[in-house]
Amino acid sequence: KAVMDELIPLAQSRPDIKAYVAPYSGTFYYRNISGTKLLSAHSFGIAIDLVYNRKDYWKWASREEGQKRLESYPKEIVEIFEKNNFIWGGKWGHFDLFHFEYRPEIIMMSRFFGNRNNEPQFWYNGAPVDNDEVKSYIKKIDETFENL
């Protein structure tokens, strides 16, 4: 909801952004990741595909075509999604430019743990643990590992 609250008005005021946003290609869709037996993030309702172009996906385009499209992709869209804990398929080696996944644990790890040294410490050392949202992510991750 937070993404759309920001993205929709931007797309309404900027035709160049709207061309990448609407009509979107899909969200919840129970299916396997192409070529695997693993469920797609779409199966869990945590992914959205925006407008697609055949040059947006690694299986449909050459690396050069994908790179050219990547360079033209509106940074504003990516920033809005990342600010709200989504990862972007445009940053993957097997690129998927129109794909965004809600993955707060990955975003949190990249924000706070990119420059760690080898000293023993809590896995979340360096994160703003006084923030309630961060605390809830830490708790959820810890509980998941306790139940393995």
Can you name each region flagged by the protein language model?
Residues 83, 98-148:
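Low-complexity, Gly/Ser/Thr/Pro-rich intrinsically disordered linker/tail segments
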Residues 1-92, 126, 143-148:
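Cell-envelope/glycan interface and biosynthesis
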Residues 94-96:
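Conserved beta-strand edge residues that scaffold enzyme active sites
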